[in-house]
Amino acid sequence: MEDISFAPAVTPDLTPAASALAARLIRNFNSAALEHFVRPPLYESLSAQLRPDRPGRKLGLSVDTVPPGKQSCPYHFHHAQEEMFVVLEGTGTLRVAGELLPIVAGDVIFVPPGPEYPHHILNTSSAPLKYLSISTKEWPEVCEYPDSGKLMAFSFVQDETTLRSVHKMDAGLDYWDSEA
């Protein structure tokens, strides 16, 4: 997915110093450009991600809208990053730790890192489901996907991808493989 920045807040009638602070610190997700992601048959979302020009370096945010019957990502858990979801509109289902939990507008969902909390959000309703996805940005990061037996390792330095590797868990090598 391409990185899309949130537009800075509109700042009429502010002093130059206040205007500069607002431009640096405030973003409005209602004016953000959306990227449409589709991977049939299960995955589809409209998403705006706050990335390159965000003032905070240890937090990430996206606004996700998932159509009825779809989900935005596979069932997974993080080794380092924490996530929080704030349901803005609609209803759906949080699949977490093998359980299905109903979610509604106004719910705030906290997901710690670790294998105890594999998760994803499904839109099981007949209307769009819109939520904020907030995460810590801990690098490097490893995600595991229990349903598909995959592992993804990735890292960023100054918002540039320096490592991204996805492979099947059972396709590993011996530590000493190909070493002299």
Q: Model segments located where?
A:
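Conserved short histidine dyad/triad with adjacent acidic residue
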Residues: E44-Q49, S62-H78, E116
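Short, conserved beta-strand element in jelly-roll/cupin
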Residues: V63-P67, H78-V96, I134-E138
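Short acidic-glycine-tyrosine-enriched beta hairpin
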Residues: G98-G114
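Ligand-binding loop in jelly-roll beta-barrel domains
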Residues: P113-P140
